[in-house]
Amino acid sequence: MSRRGSILHSRTQWLLLGLALLFSLVLFMYLLECAPQTDGNASLPGVVRENYGKEYYQALLQEQEEHYQTRATSLKRQIAQLKQELQDMSEKMRALQERKKLGANGVGYPGNREQAPSDLLEFLHSQIDRAEVSVGAKLPSEYGVVPFESFTLMKVFQLEMGLTRHPEEKPVRKDKRDELVEVIEAGVEVINNPDEDDAQEDEEGPLGEKLIFNENDFIEGYYRTERDKGTQYELFFKKADLMEYRHVTLFRPFGPLMKVKNELIDITRSVINIIVPLAERTEAFSQFMQNFRDVCIHQDKRIHLTVVYFGKEGLSKVKSILESVSSESDFHNYTLVSLDEEFNRGRGLNVGARAWDKGEVLMFFCDVDIYFSAEFLNSCRLNAEPGKKVFYPVVFSLYNPAIVYANQDVPPPVEQQLVHKKDSGFWRDFGFGMTCQYQSDFLSVGGFDMEVKGWGGEDVHLYRKYLHGDLIVIRTPVPGLFHLWHEKHCADELTPEQYRMCIQSKAMNEASHSHLGMMVFREEIEMHLRKQAYRTNSETAG
């Protein structure tokens, strides 16, 4: 027994020494890769010695810097993996030693400890078999296909853009960048260290050496996700001086569902302080109060309304509307704050948030053009938590009813316009004005930026404060929140950036792509109809 233990101890030492040497080698390669080039006469790759502009060299340097950053990240990840493997191996050897000692004392082990990892591995392999990787699936229509999105080392080409993303862009989220870098590294590893069952022969270079691929040999890739199975990656590599491509297919299977939390949430006593900044627009406020009375007073009954009014014109009308609703519905949970100054949405919401002095409260920052349901108010309560979560719902913005319902004599009532259709509106995924958050969280981040004047911008500033903090931001489209169409006026006093945002919002608010197209080609359509009518009349007369 002692001899066997000494042999095991000796093997453990050699194994740890080997892993340490391998770690040192990778670290040495990383230092060489990151070391600056000292050859001052060497030209940049692909650059002919001509007079180029400053922008050209800046773009080239930025591209090189991004390449080296990607490579450095790759090497750092490999070092971290080696450290983890070294630690895992040490723990395994330590556990083996402990088992040996316990076994000598006659202590037995249950035989099913390895059963769970084995079952999990079997499940993950079954996910590959279920996915549409090797064999196609029978689909009901052309819309059943899950399309791929393509990517290169620097760009992603995507189909689902919403209103804020671009057809071609660099991955903004760090997790997406890391995912694609990891996939390319895994593809390189598969090519350079093939399994015995891989149907490929080792390629040789011009001098007979084994070809070693790296990230720079990556040409393009495609990926798609089947929500219940996993993500499939198709990768293509090619050496610059060779005609053959190397194709690698990878699959990241989704594991079984795991319980994270099971809790009871009591929202029966949760009061929402709805804060509405307002200037003039008394007719819109009257319509808003109709929705408020139906939803908040008659159904929800756990609401406080705070209206922050700017200026003197229209103030008496707003007071009259509030008093009328109060007397008709016996509702007194409202506050009217009057500010004799120029309208500033951020300023109004700041004042409205601080006007509440009855302890912690959930706030809903709302505009006078918003229509919401009782179900949305409960979503507001469920998705905001003090010190943990803020809720930023995506509003469904309705198009101009005069265009949407142009074939009708008059547009239908507002309640009948609240439908989620492509020609009736769009998800306003570039807007961050409607939000549910607790007063303490709002005050802890400093509220709105008072330097932002006029239209837009202050919402994004507040949103970014939460993104840069520790709170979870819940961002999702919700069915019970609508932005009613109203004509926009972009003031000349706005900054160029604010004016651009205002015009962009105005254009997107007007009508769908198909309706705008019909308006552009209206004369051509009318001419076609006249020709058709003339031809029909001629044939009838003949």
UniProtKB/Swiss-Prot annotation:
GO BP, sorted A to Z: chondroitin sulfate proteoglycan biosynthetic process; dermatan sulfate proteoglycan biosynthetic process; proteoglycan biosynthetic process
Record's catalysed reaction(s): 3-O-(beta-D-GlcA-(1->3)-beta-D-Gal-(1->3)-beta-D-Gal-(1->4)-beta-D-Xyl)-L-seryl-[protein] + UDP-N-acetyl-alpha-D-galactosamine = 3-O-(beta-D-GalNAc-(1->4)-beta-D-GlcA-(1->3)-beta-D-Gal-(1->3)-beta-D-Gal-(1->4)-beta-D-Xyl)-L-seryl-[protein] + UDP + H(+)
EC number(s) recorded for this UniProt protein: 2.4.1.174
Subcellular locations according to the entry: Golgi apparatus, Golgi stack membrane
ATP-binding keyword on record: no
Keyword list, A-Z: Coiled coil, Glycoprotein, Golgi apparatus, Membrane, Metal-binding, Signal-anchor, Transferase, Transmembrane, Transmembrane helix
GO CC field: Golgi apparatus; Golgi cisterna membrane
Annotated disulfide bonds: none
Enzyme class, broadest EC rank: transferase
Coiled coil regions in record: 59-105
Segments on the Lumenal face: 35-542
Transmembrane spans: 14-34
Binding-site residues, a divalent metal cation: D369, H486
InterPro entries in the cross-refs: Chond_GalNAc, CS_glycosyltransferase, Nucleotide-diphossugar_trans
Superkingdom of source: Eukaryota
Membrane topology: Single-pass type II membrane protein
Residue ranges that the UniProt entry lists as topological domain Cytoplasmic: 1-13
Glycosylation sites noted in the Swiss-Prot or TrEMBL record: N41, N333
GO molecular-function term, one example from the UniProt record: acetylgalactosaminyltransferase activity
Free-text function comment from the UniProt entry: Transfers 1,4-N-acetylgalactosamine (GalNAc) from UDP-GalNAc to the non-reducing end of glucuronic acid (GlcUA). Required for addition of the first GalNAc to the core tetrasaccharide linker and for elongation of chondroitin chains.
PANTHER family the record matches: CHONDROITIN SULFATE N-ACETYLGALACTOSAMINYLTRANSFERASE 2, CHONDROITIN SYNTHASE
Record's protein name: Chondroitin sulfate N-acetylgalactosaminyltransferase 2
Organism: Mus musculus
Gene expressing this chain: Csgalnact2
